[in-house]
Amino acid sequence: MDLEHESKRPLYIPYAGPILLEFPLLNKGSAFSEEERNTFNLNGLLPEAIETIEEQVERAYRQFCDFHSATEQHIYLRNIQDTNETLFYRLLRSHLSEMMPIIYTPTVGEACEHFSYIYRRARGLFIAYPNRDRIDDMLQNATKQNVKVIVVTDGERILGLGDQGIGGMGIPIGKLSLYTACGGISPAYTLPVVLDVGTNNPQRLNDPLYMGWRHPRITGDEYNAFVEEFIQAVKRRWPDVLLQFEDFAQKNAMPLLSRYRDRLCCFNDDIQGTAAVTLGSLIAASHAAGSRLRDQTITFLGAGSAGCGIAEQIIAQMIAEGLSDEEARTRIFMVDRFGLLTDRLPNLLDFQSRLVQKRQALAGWQTESEGISLLDVVRNAHPTVLIGVSGQPGLFSEAIVREMHSHCPRPIIMPLSNPTSRVEARPEDIINWTDGAALVASGSPFEPVLYQGERYPIAQCNNAYIFPGIGLGVLASGARRVTDGMLMAASRALADSSPLARDGHGSLLPDLKDIQQVSRDIAFQVAKAAQRQGVAVQTSDEALLQAIEHNFWLPIYRSYKRTSF
């Protein structure tokens, strides 16, 4: 898209004076032109100098660097976002690799824990259970009228930090910031939402500054009815919206996705987004290791909704590569806190029961106890891939990693739990324990590892590589649903962008500086899949590419003309 041409298209604005300066989507600060200052009654409200956005970015970046903690930097960036969104996204675009860990993981975890302390200004919607009969009114109160993407959480399972109540709002805000920074979704079209159903976190309930509903979490039929009321209200207000479920507890995440995925355009990023980015990374890693995904034996530590969602996506890809469903499932070993999931374990959840190993098939295994531990699985199954989604730090021990490497010359190891404090193993340790042989991708950002004079880049298996492209593809195609085929297309497009798989060297995943183009590529493949599966209108490839560019918002200042309400 031609930035200069786009910037010449004027916007007609009914606001003026201090009100205009308080409108983050429209405020330009010191970049208002002389003509605009005269037209919109801004004279005297701004310093004399008229600046370019580049000059504003330079000042903002200097101020950013003056803060010495990541949390302070997070607060500073959020303040810019709440003051001047165009400047915020231009700043992110200029320093994305440096700032993504600040606006999202790992720093957003601490911001959620301290949400009620660092709260400055309202953003998004707080829909509390006591006000459940007024949800329609709340949606009408939203400052953005043409909402196209909603990210909603109930705050119960925030990253690996557990129940944060309304502090979980930091996650939808951060996710939508990445929809815009990485996927070009206009901030005018996005809305973060937290469903305040109480909290079971005693630290929040006993905190005099906690800003949420001070009540134990509602559950069961009351909870489900409340979510249903919210979904119905959203469908009435914005029937074509894309809704992303975010950080719901395991007991609710999969049931909500199953209940609503065929009723509106929605997906769960923890289950489907994590699965898609992990699958894309695994396809690329398999190619880099000289094999295919169908040839891998994969062990998971963590058998919750996220881990099982990843496993099901991997199985679907293995089937696409020629295995039967039964053959694919025998290659997947799910381990949780009780050990390997087998057909003899009681009280398994529905989505876990499809991923059990038959205990009879393990009769020849040598194990240390009746419960089959992760180390037992590694010793007997000889996995080539180890994936951590446990939320528990340090569980990929030296003994486990070395045992895996003794059977696999090029192990693929992915400690995906975040934030950084929850990672199953540090990439530096994995590289050392495997003598530099492992392909490593992590859930949180890590610096490259230096080992025996060689530099090993550590790919961050970040959902930001996937969900912005999915959102852009849905908007560009007008898709009515998010299908498994669309998610599979996103994974394959991500794998195709891997420098390591393509060139034989470099990182497993693209550099963040290229993420906007990656999002465009993913959006195109997602949109094509939507058309093939009948959930979007058929168009030519050229028309689809034009729609993607048309929907890709860029952080530039446009000229303003005065109009009336």
Curated annotation (Swiss-Prot):
Q: Name one Pfam family in it.
A: malic
Q: Give the matching Gene3D superfamilies.
A: Malic enzyme, N-terminal domain, NAD(P)-binding Rossmann-like Domain
User: Keyword Transferase on this protein?
Assistant: no
Q: Which key words are in the record?
A: Metal-binding, NAD, Oxidoreductase
Cofactor binding mode, per the note? Answer: Divalent metal cations. Prefers magnesium or manganese.
The cofactors it requires, by name, are: Mg(2+); Mn(2+)
Active site per the UniProt annotation: Y104 (proton donor), K175 (proton acceptor)
Give its E.C. classification number.
Answer: 1.1.1.38
Origin superkingdom: Bacteria
Positions bound to a divalent metal cation: E246, D247, D270
Residues the record annotates as the site (Important for activity) are D270
The record's annotation in NCBIfam families points to: PRK13529.1 (NF010052)
Name assigned to this protein: NAD-dependent malic enzyme
Gene designation per UniProt: maeA
